[in-house]
């Protein structure tokens, strides 16, 4: 007589449906902290390396950042202004260059403890957040910066000659790139809220009137310039990102 156990939960039929981490190897808290320390050190060393390389190539980077300001002469208004501004630019470049590597280290750290379902959600979100941030920076450089600078240069150009401070210009352009990159993270926030069940896509659609007001305010806050053209472009981009996030949630049926 062939007897088959009736309480075997891990049969060939249902083993594929068991949601457990693929690398389910127990680690002590000390081991977790040691791994976290090592990966943090890797990220810091990569940041130092990227910042150093950026500083050695600062003339090329400065030329790229100056490109949107066509016809503008930059002045050094204080001793060492160019030097300290160069350090600031190199640090910003180091942060941007390190971000993908930092996300990669985060993925390696959390990957062993994730279930198959969690991997399908978290890993694409992490990768998408980096891509969206880079896309936001590119959008700011090729769209927002030229629009803002064209307005600021042309306004009153027949009365005053535009001579700009090197440091103030780079504060302006770097803040514009950073704020736009952060604004492009809106769909990621929406996905997190939708997947967690905090807000549904239908609730986000019903809030469209408030979102228009918020987008207008965000356009004024996130753009370092006060010209209406740049603020309008930024507000429109925020709205498109918001409704794009809703479309993704609708596809996911959230």
Curated annotation (Swiss-Prot):
Entry's localization field: Plastid, Chloroplast membrane
UniProt key word Transmembrane: yes
InterPro entries per UniProt: Sec-indep_translocase_CS, TatC
Any single GO BP term: protein transport by the Tat complex
A Pfam family it matches: TatC
Transmembrane segments: 41-61, 64-84, 91-111, 125-145, 146-166, 172-192, 204-224, 232-252
Identification of the protein by name: Uncharacterized tatC-like protein ycf43
Gene that produces this protein: ycf43
Similarity field: Belongs to the TatC family.
Molecular functions per Gene Ontology: proton motive force dependent protein transmembrane transporter activity
Keyword tags: Chloroplast, Membrane, Plastid, Transmembrane, Transmembrane helix
NCBIfam families linked: tatC (TIGR00945)
Keyword Methyltransferase listed: no
Primary location recorded for the protein, binned into one broad class: plastid
